[in-house]
Amino acid sequence: MSRFLSHLAELQPELFAEMSPELAVELKIGNGDYISIVSLRGAIQARALVSRRIRPLHLDGKIVHQIAMPFHFGSAGPVKGGSTNDLIPISGEPNVTIMEAKALTCNIVPGRLPRGPAFEDWLNKYVPKGGPANLHPEQPAEGAPCARAGGGHGLEGKIDNR
């Protein structure tokens, strides 16, 4: 499941974000419209897929919306575009060395991402609360646990904050 498989690239040529009809109405987004998704780690653009498969949650008297996005796409291959993994922090699961983080807080903005110098201003405007954005993958977010070289599996679940 990647953009390197030509038949899959032909069937799904662009990244999509599946959302509930309620969220689409709230944000004035139509099925197939371009949207921008922004998190504390970055921003990507995708096409909106409005679907009843995704439903809002009712938590503690509040409505919480969710979206679903495939994470098997990258920025290389015959079909290029945004990668969902650009939105999440780097957190490799040590046993199988794949990303363990598959949930995040984000904002959805109708329209395409701005290019050039306007991108940074746009990002700072729409980044979720808790910012500022941390666009350097090698730099952990402020307050995040940080493992140092020489630690690893031998710590048995303890975080090395030397």
State where each predicted segment sits.
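Long, contiguous, secondary-structure-rich segments that constitute the structural scaffold
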Residues: 2-162
